[in-house]
Structures are given as structure tokens and as C-alpha cells.
Amino acid sequence: MCPPVRIYGKNRHTEEMSEMLEQQREYVLRTVEERGVRLVRLWFTDILGNLKSFAISPAELENALEDGMTFDGSSIEGFSRVQEADVLAIPDPNTFEVLPWADPKGTEARVFCNIHNLDGTPFDADPRQVLKRNLDAAVKLGYAFYIAPDIEYFYFAPPQKGELPQPLDEGGFFDLTTSDIATSLRKETIRTLETMGIPVEYSFHEDAPSQHEIDLRHTDALTMADSIMTFRLAVREVAAMHNVHATFMPKPLEGVQGSGMHLHLSLFKGEDNAFYDEKDAYNLSPTAKSFMAGLLRHAAEITAVTNQTVNSYKRLVPGFEAPVHISWARNNRSGLIRVPVPKKGNAMATRIEYRSPDPATNPYLAFSVILAAGLRGIEQGYTLPVEADANLFEMSDADLNKLSIEQLPQSLADALDIMERSELVASALGEHIFEWFLRNKRAEWRGYKTQVTPFELNRYLRSL
């Protein structure tokens, strides 16, 4: 891991930062003119992590960068009520990029926005503002939060109503094949991402048919959340240009593993990796151990956020390399937290891997609750449980109970029940998002419960 480059709290370099912000605004305006940009898309997300956008002309951009652009917040589910509809989108010029996919009507660019109330205060329903607030809490303790995700997804033929998903290949882990459409799509996606300033570390074919993984290089949490939103759109855009459907649904196929988004986490203090201790047997500092302990203690509470769909829990089952048990170990992929063994002497690479999240999550909210859980462990001095280095999938319930190893929630309903009682999650998300999220996801669960599935028809229709 590299030392942090972006800090979000107040500091003595305010004037210097203002000057840098002004320079970035000038760069954006100059680039728009030089590249012949015809439209600038202002991006933000709703509470569930769906990417939203409206476009402005270059003539409006300078005003937007200075004062923001108003829009009707009541048109975004979970944002505003009709009687208090208007909100303000203020572009973050650090996120400006020209979109690399071709548009016959002219070049387009995008910039992420922070959403504010009209009086200039942060808007409670903006997930990006929620993450910034939680990052500020880390800064007050002297930490910068870094993340590197391993993002899995599937390519399918264009879906037809009533038909099962049709994979494009039957490959497995690390398969090297002759030229095929899925591999070509992955390569083109990587080129697209790097054109947009999103560096890629690894990419390969995953275990399931037509399943692929792209791992992004670590960066600060806010930049990474923006990058994940861009990543999901880029994967879909590239696939759609070739009449292929890309999906981040956690478990689209039964009988094979689902798609996860393992998160490699670290804290930096100044230029030092706060998770590293060369004198420790695991090279883990007390800070790292308390952070891990916080994640383990609050894991069940944050699972509804990191795994927010009904379908998410069909991935979190034994036998498919997804975590089920709340435990940690070095290089053991059956637990919730894995501690990768870095190359010898590489203090910067010391990190932990949190393995339960899936790529359907809202990264701004997921990073917020993960950070809040870890910081709670640090602030209150939580003790890290004993390492569970056995294959947990092969252990009996009795043996797991002896080790006091609990399970993650087994359904969205279970996860919501636990989340609803969590003071930590309520504080991390804020009252508005916390309550709206629970209402929305309760409605999703009720809708799911009324469905009669093919499994039930095949099992019961003839026999009962």
C-alpha cells in the first residue's frame, strides 16, 4: 500500500488547498475546450448505489463548478419530499474525466458531485457525503483509509424474459483460452478504465462459467468509491457495444460460486502503514488488530449494507468460497477476514481482506459502515479473537460453537433485523439513510416472500 495523497479533514493548509482546487477547476475548463467536449454529465448516486446523472453544456460548467447546479431531489427515490424538493449538485473537479466510449453526437465528460441543501449544508441522503463524513472521523484520529477491491462479475448473452442466463464460455480459474469474446471484453474494459485514470492490478477468468475478475489498485476510499461506480458502468458499456450483457448480480447461476467484491483495507498515519508492526508474529500492529476486532464484532450489523439484496445471501453459503462464519485467519479463505502475507519486508502492503461484500453494494455506504466498525474497535480497544486457521466449511456446528464462532446473517430479513438494532450503523449512515434503507429493503423482502419460485413448483407441484 502507498501513503495517502488525499486528506478530507480540516488542516492548516486550507489556503493551499483552495489554490489547488482553483487550479483543478481551470484544468477542467481548459480540457473541455481543448477536447471539444459537447456535454458534461454530473454524476451522483441514490441511496442504493444506482448511478444518476444529468447533463449540462460547457457554457454552464464554470458556473456549476463555482456555485453548483440545482435539480429536483424529489425525483430521486429516497432523496427529498416534494415540498422540499430542490437540492444542489456541486461538482468535485478532482473527478473530471472525458468518457472514452464513443458517442456519435460528440465527446462527453463526467464529474462526480457532492449533493448539498440549498443553504450549502451537506445533504443527508447523499451517500458520497456520508462517506466523506466518516472519513473526516478517521482524519480526526490521524488516519487515512485505503481500499483495493477484487471485483467479480458475469458476462451473458442478452437476457430473454423467462429464460435462464446464458454464459458465453465454460472456463474456470485462470483459464487461458484462444481469443474469445469474453476475454476480449475484459481486455477492452481494462484499457477503458486506465484511459479514465483507474489503474488495474490483475484480471483473470474466475471459477464459474463466464465469470471474470478485475482487481483495482489501492487508493483512498473516496476515490475508490467513485472508481467502483465508474467501473460498473464501464464494464456494462463495453459489453453492450458488443451485444453482451454484463451483470454484478451476486448469484445469477445456481451450483457455482457467486460474485463477490473482496476489499483489501488499510489505514495510514502520515506516510506510515498503521497496520504494520515488524515485531509482531503476524506483522500486525495493535491498531490493525483492534480494527479487525471491530469488524468482527459488528460484522452482522453491517451485512445488510455490504450485502443489500435478497440474492446476496444465496452467495453467502458453504461450499462456494464465500464467507459464512465471522472469523479471521492468515491466508485462509473460509473466514470473513483474511490477512494476506505480503512480500518479505513490504510494510506498505500490510492489509486485511474483508471478504463478504458483493459488487451490488453501494460502495459509499459499505465503506462508511466498514470504517465505522473498525474505528470503533480502535477507539474502544477491542481484543482480537483467536485465529481460526482450520477449514471452517469442514467443521461441525458443535466445533464452531466451542470456538464461539458465529455466522453471518443467512437472509436479507435476518440482516435487517440485526441492522435495525445497531447504534453503530445508524450513526455511520445518519438517520435519514438508515431509516429509508430499512424501509426500502423491508419492502424488497416482502415482495420476495410472495414469489412462487421454480424450485417450489418443481419440488411440490406433482408430489403434493
Specify the residue positions occupied by each region the protein language model found.
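Short, Lys/Arg-enriched N-terminal segments with co-localized hydrophobic residues
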Residues: 2-19
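Glycine-rich, acidic/polar active-site loops that bind/position phosphate-bearing ligands
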Residues: 18-464
